[in-house]
Amino acid sequence: MVYSYTEKKRIRKDFGKRPQVLDIPYLLSIQLDSFTKFIEQDPEGQYGLEAAFRSVFPIQSYNGNSKLEYVSYNLREPEFDVKECQIRGVTYSAPLRVKLRLVVYDKDAPAGTVKDIKEQEVYMGEIPLMTDNGTFVINGTERVIVSQLHRSPGVFFDSDKGKTHSSGKVLYNARVIPYRGSWLDFEFDPKDNLFVRIDRRRKLPATIILRALRKTTEEILDLFFDKVVFEVKDQTLMMELLPERLRGETATFDIESNGKVYVEAGRRITARHIRQLTKDEVNNIEVPVDYIVGKVASHDYVNEDTGEIIIAANQEFSLEDLANLSQAGHKKIEVLFTNDLDHGAYISDTLRADSTVDRLSALVEVYRMMRPGEPPTKEAAESLFESLFFSEDRYDLSTVGRMKFNSSIGRDNGEGAGILDETDIIEVMRKLIDIRNGKGEVDDIDHLGNRRIRSVGEMAENQFRVGLVRVERAVRERLSLGDLDAIMPQDLINAKPISAAVKEFFGSSQLSQFMDQNNPLSEVTHKRRISALGPGGLTRERAGFEVRDVHATHYGRLCPIETPEGPNIGLINSLSAYARCNEYGFLETPYRRVVDNIVTEDVDYLSAIEEGTFVIAQANAVLTEEGTFADELIIARQKGESGLHPREHIQYMDVATNQVVSVAASLIPFLEHDDANRALMGANMQRQAVPTLRADKPLVGTGIERCVAIDSGVTAVAKRGGMVQSVDASRIVIKVNEEELVPGEAGIDIYNLTKYTRSNQNTCINQRPTVLPGEPVTRGDVLADGPSTDLGELALGQNMRIAFMPWNGYNFEDSILVSERVVQEDRFTTIHIQELSCVARDTKLGSEEITADIPNVGEAALSKLDESGIVYIGAEVKGGDILVGKVTPKGETQLTPEEKLLRAIFGEKASDVKDSSLRVPNSVSGTIIDVQVFTRDGVEKDKRALEIEQMQLKEAKKDITEEFQILEGGLLARVRTLLTLAGTSEVKLDAMDRKQWLEITLDDESQQNQLEQLAEQYDELKAEFDKKFETKRRKITQGDDLAPGVLKIVKVYLAVKRRIQPGDKMAGRHGNKGVISKINPVEDMPYDEKGQPVDIVLNPLGVPSRMNIGQILEVHMGLAAKGVGDKLNQMLKEQQELHKFRNFLQKVYDLGETRQEVDIAALSDDEVRTLVKNLRGGLPIATPIFDGAPESSIKELLKLVDLPESGQLKLFDGRTGDAFERPVTVGYMYMLKLNHLVDDKMHARSTGSYSLVTQQPLGGKAQFGGQRFGEMEVWALEAYGAAYTLQEMLTVKSDDVNGRTKMYKNIVDGDHRMEPGMPESFNVLLKEIRSLGINIELEDEE
């Protein structure tokens, strides 16, 4: 395997055995691809904005004299970049301009004569843009649009499984679901009549729809039934016979032909009888005359002479009818073929229940059902029915829906119209009847072939279309009313409804969520989340077990492990590592193709439907060298069932062992040894890990840490290879390799790093360079680590030395005992950044002012403010300190303009202003790291704002100048090379000013041309940078667009350092969570024979019942990994030669039969030194899930570094020095500190706010609430008979208003008595009883 320069710095030992056929695809592609599809111009008009415009335009006026056509659209550049939007609190969006054409027809000339055409670009609101990392910045905060899993449009056949009717009879139904439009349901009732519902309204006989489609009774019967023909001969009836139709019937008469009796009367007709009849080619048999009684006529039989109908279609025959028919001379009689087994008379019965006779009555019936109470007219009824399923404006199946519809009813082609036609409706009814007759299966609604993903782009497009449709109505009216000669397209379009619809979707849709930004993994997982909730989806309350359950088709598409615990379980899923969406929105997963028993490297992506019938082997099937299966029988899956299949039958094989699970679950080493419930907790808790001060890579990982860190976008990744030219804390400059240059560019890439920024969860985002000047980098190398990444690998926690043993009850019930050393070394110290803002508004009584001149505040309180009244950067503040001084005018009377003027001149302020400064919240203390001041346009900036502005300008200038100098240097270096080639001496060049080089003329024409080109580039570069600086200057100095009534906003950023302390929640990666019970001095912790104390003591009882054995294996493996580091340190101490290090490392990397090949000999001496330096803390190990290190490899590695193979060490008690009775499992586990910190939860109150109605204290920290003394607590005091304590609890300490104020007063006066009165909640109870009409009066006891 080839390692890049930065990967060589720390090579992770991989224990995986299966070859890697396919790299994990880019993790955020589901978001980025979908949104790109939305905003990129699609010439076909199938997707995105283009599709939305084409579906609404052209808009015709009502009178047909004019129309507005759509030509094209373009998105301009956004005004601010992403970072500026976040700072200013605005949306990162681009203005949408649409070219429209207004065509006016001449009404006097012949139809279609054009009188005038006007084209114009019209502004149609702002479209929020996606950042490179798949998020949106809406009002300054990063949000994610979660993809939705919804029922695919199409037709679904289902049954009630016998639950509806008391008899337990299974009732079948069919439902046609369009992408937009009315739902059409067909259903059977217990009497086997077929009914139709539109939009879940009341049901009508299904034949009404057919009548409305201009079908007569005869045509309807013709569509659904086969015929049986009888011939009348004298006194007998001959019946045409198809033997197959007799199966399962009981003969009511002897079935004979040519004197041979085939079936005797009363016998059941079997398959043997049918074979005999077929063999003898019996086509006609004689039947008794009464056999026809009760059969149904297939069409009207008319008396030719009189014209009267003898028997109408769908009427049952009687003997009398038969006589009349033979009298009228009808010799052939056709009846419907029905039986109870597999040809039910459902449609025939339904027709009898159907009261309508012709199309009009059917349309009226539909109209009455859809619009009850409105008088139906013929036109209204017709237009309503047409618009339901046959109008492209109101109904659309979509391409997916049509494809699913056609495949459901058995058509071959996947194309067709977006609307229904009569054949579609008839086919659906036919298929439903077939299913009722026992042919065909009902659909499985939870199959992933019937559920599709709706991603950002599609949802945004739908929302945009909603806005356009609102505009369409207004445009129509304006076109019909306005003066068309004077009107321009601009005057017709009002962009407000469009931007309102888009804004509403991005700002407040259920699927637009505040991004979970705890750490890189939580970001990635949030963007890959698939929710079944949301508009058009399920609701928590209605979703049953089946929807939430893991389905066989989830394999490789949705993760069976990662889903929230609680009410949303199974409704919110995560995309599996390799899954992707196909063009129809169905999830696909990759498989290796098997051709002629050989497993090839070719990969096919299959959707759940395509996968259906294939036999698919698992990724861990054993293969020979040639790529054939080693075993005769292979464990494989077919139609969702696992079983043993002969190797010749296998058609596909899984791509990777982790293709079943999501990214978060793939990060858990030894996942295969954990119980699923705990794995679920482990996967979910990794997302809550807080980035620590110094990230520490996991010693035991799974090998995909690098992939997650890079794809998450928190690291700076090289776009092109080259040489690192300069590095400082905030920027990295790379000189690009010659071969990767675009002709005519300077060849310098500049990466600006993010420093100490606040995340959505108030954690700290900070990037640190990992490269040094002069180092070579290749494309895709990590240049700077972000939060929770270490040398480009995801690092959510810290490797801690752990012992599994009880310790004086301090690890009872999952508590965790931690050594003081962990606190001293700041292993779990985290930085949290809070944003506090102060807003100065314009009030009725005058404007608020930000100032250091605050009434009745001492000097000490103002010591940290500057003259503008804003705290200075670097100040250490604690709860209650003033951050921004602000005064608000308080006035009992509103001032007259004259008084206002006098006040303005003489500045009498102090008397009538109150202090409304921004103070630090009570429980917070920290350091001010940044201040931002936003001033409204037209309001004078204060001194601090100007200082900040100057500083920003200076920084921007420095940035742009440096960037220019670097690029200029690169360009001039090329000029110098050119000049020296042309023979100019270097001494002469050095004597000149560098810019004069461009003015030199050369003899050689081609060289002169090159020089001129470079000179031109130089001028362009200079002009570009001047323009860049001017733009930046304008952005910095212009006023800010603030909300109405806001004059000034000051944002103060406060950094808080949180050390680990008792009450904080910690967890491993295997769902083993606990709360810190005590920080123990190092000297009291258990230590081993070398005197090395452990960092954390965990309870061994937390393992067996939870069945997450992965943590034990991780601890053993961690011990071995650390052992390698210790061994290297020992060798360094002994100052051994380099070749011994090489040999030892080679031995380590060669251990076990793995796919990884590391050739230490190929590394240079410096590279080996760097590698050893980075491995001193321990050898990082990858054990991929389901393909991890076996027990033997762990033992082998432990043996190699001279540690006991049991993984257990002899420990001594730190307090007494005595050895513990038996060896203890000691090793290294990767521990996370979760974002459930005791500082955020602890809260105290003596008095505070009360609820309005009950007058009881509120609950919770956010409301500054008290503790609730609930029902059970009252019982406890009752049980003890503590009457006075109870009385105090229920009155003066809770909701006895007078009692509690009196008590407060008494305490102030030093009098410690209390007089309980009437609790307010009792008054509330009285009021509630009175509201029920029962009067209650309280009697005073005299």
From Swiss-Prot:
It holds the Pfam family RNA_pol_Rpb2_3. The gene is rpoB. GO terms for cellular component: DNA-directed RNA polymerase complex. Belongs to the RNA polymerase beta chain family. One of its GO terms (biological process) is DNA-templated transcription. InterPro entries: DNA-dir_RNA_pol_bsu_ext_1_sf (IPR042107), DNA-dir_RNA_pol_bsu_external_1 (IPR019462), DNA-dir_RNA_pol_su2 (IPR015712), DNA-dir_RNAP_su2_dom (IPR007120), DNA-dir_RNAP_su2_hyb_sf (IPR037033), RNA_pol_bsu_bac (IPR010243), RNA_pol_bsu_CS (IPR007121), RNA_pol_bsu_protrusion (IPR007644). It comes from Aliivibrio salmonicida (strain LFI1238). PROSITE patterns: RNA_POL_BETA (PS01166). NCBIfam families: PRK00405.1, rpoB. This is DNA-directed RNA polymerase subunit beta. Keywords: DNA-directed RNA polymerase, Nucleotidyltransferase, Transcription, Transferase. CDD domains: RNA_pol_B_RPB2 (cd00653). The RNAP catalytic core consists of 2 alpha, 1 beta, 1 beta' and 1 omega subunit. When a sigma factor is associated with the core the holoenzyme is formed, which can initiate transcription. It catalyses: RNA(n) + a ribonucleoside 5'-triphosphate = RNA(n+1) + diphosphate. DNA-dependent RNA polymerase catalyzes the transcription of DNA into RNA using the four ribonucleoside triphosphates as substrates. GO terms for molecular function: DNA binding; DNA-directed RNA polymerase activity; ribonucleoside binding. Its EC number is 2.7.7.6.
